[in-house]
């Protein structure tokens, strides 16, 4: 008995990565959040005059949850802003509802994007004289 579903995927087995729809919705949410952070003056005192960039948004398979990876421009202390971002998440979600063409708008969760910090640490290590000597 063949239990293959659409596109030959076996029923009951998780896909190896996000679907095209998850990727498309994630990119649309990322674009809209980035625009909101650029154009909105938040009343929360912790977010006044703070520049935040949204580097990636991952959407759950059921499209009900969005994890937004954020970085603070020019600084690496984005973790201190996570409570403030959690407070403004319902406002951001309501703004997303006007632009997303989905039955339901995903709940937004914020995580710090540490990829840039990690890349800078690796770069600093590679520039150390003893490491550079070994690489030559």
Curated annotation (Swiss-Prot):
Q: Which gene encodes it?
A: rbfA
Q: Whose protein is this, by species?
A: Gluconacetobacter diazotrophicus (strain ATCC 49037 / DSM 5601 / CCUG 37298 / CIP 103539 / LMG 7603 / PAl5)
Cytoplasm is among the record's keywords: yes
**What keywords are annotated for this sequence in UniProt?**
Cytoplasm, Ribosome biogenesis
Q: Where are the transmembrane segments?
A: none
Where found in the cell? Cytoplasm
Supply the Gene3D superfamilies for this chain.
3.30.300.20
GO cellular component entries: cytosol
One GO BP on record is: maturation of SSU-rRNA
**Function as written in the Swiss-Prot or TrEMBL entry:** One of several proteins that assist in the late maturation steps of the functional core of the 30S ribosomal subunit. Associates with free 30S ribosomal subunits (but not with 30S subunits that are part of 70S ribosomes or polysomes). Required for efficient processing of 16S rRNA. May interact with the 5'-terminal helix region of 16S rRNA.
Superkingdom per UniProt = Bacteria
GO molecular function annotations of the record: ribosomal small subunit binding
Q: How does it assemble?
A: Monomer. Binds 30S ribosomal subunits, but not 50S ribosomal subunits or 70S ribosomes.
Q: Please give the name of this protein.
A: Ribosome-binding factor A
Spans annotated as Disordered: 1-22
Its family? Belongs to the RbfA family.
Q: What is its main location?
A: cytoplasm
* HAMAP family found in the cross-reference section: RbfA (MF_00003)
């Amino acid at each position: 008995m063949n239990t293959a579903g659409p596109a030959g995927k076996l029923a009951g087995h998780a896909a190896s990565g996000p679907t095209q729809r998850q990727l498309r919705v994630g990119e649309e949410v990322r674009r809209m959040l980035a625009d909101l952070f650029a154009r909105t003056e938040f009343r929360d005192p912790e977010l006044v005059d703070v520049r935040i960039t949204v580097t990636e948004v991952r959407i759950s398979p059921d499209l009900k949850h969005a994890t937004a990876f954020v970085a603070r421009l020019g600084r690496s202390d984005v973790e201190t802003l996570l409570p403030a971002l959690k407070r403004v998440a319902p406002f951001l979600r309501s703004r997303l509802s006007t632009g997303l063409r989905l039955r339901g708008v995903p709940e937004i969760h914020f995580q710090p994007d540490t990829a840039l910090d990690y890349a800078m640490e690796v770069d600093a290590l590679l520039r150390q004289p003893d490491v550079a000597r070994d690489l030559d």
